[in-house]
Amino acid sequence: MEIFNTAPLSLPRLPDKARVTLLALGDVGSTLLMGLRLLGGDVISSIGICDVRDNVAARWEFELDQIAPPETEPLPEVDIIAPEQLFDGDVFLFCASRMVPDTSVTSGDVRMAQYGLNRELAALYARKAREARYRGLFCVVSDPVDPLCRAALRESALAPAQVRGFGLGVMHARAMYYAGKDGR
């Protein structure tokens, strides 16, 4: 009897140019959105944005769709979508957060302080992905990335290869930042 399935996990098949949907346009989501709009034209067809604050999504759509470099391929169009449309794309980016610790907090792991409330939010959208029979990538960008990926995987019934976290690069960069300040 085989205890472990050793078959490699394969990512969902994405089109040459993927439809990306992004939830929450706070500091993280809006920074990511700018990068995707400016640098993602070769792999992104369009970007759907959703935020609980309608005026925030409208502002970003207004600003970003007016950026057009003169001599390059067209940039991916940004459009405002309803929450029900978040899982109509190929790649879903979860940037939502109910709690961001103040920068003055110095004791304890601030990412874990975020976990309780953010877990509920990640679980909610994971269940929505399940209800929508979502077949694309569910990408977690909000902190703490690894525990939120686990919560999303458990709540969604998505395949493990569909849930991706983007946190190790941040942790490496944070370590490099503090190492550079250390002076030893």
State what each model feature region is.
Residues 2, 46, 50-89:
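Conserved N-terminal Rossmann-fold NAD(P) cofactor-binding segment
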Residues 19, 166, 173-184:
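Substrate/ligand-engaging "lid" and interaction regions
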Residues 25-30, 53-55, 140-150, 167-172:
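Gly/Ser/Thr-rich loops at beta-strand to alpha-helix junctions
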Residues 38-42, 65-69, 85, 131, ...:
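Short, surface-exposed basic-aromatic patches at helix termini and helix-loop junctions that form
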Residues 73-135:
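Rossmann-like NAD(P)-binding element
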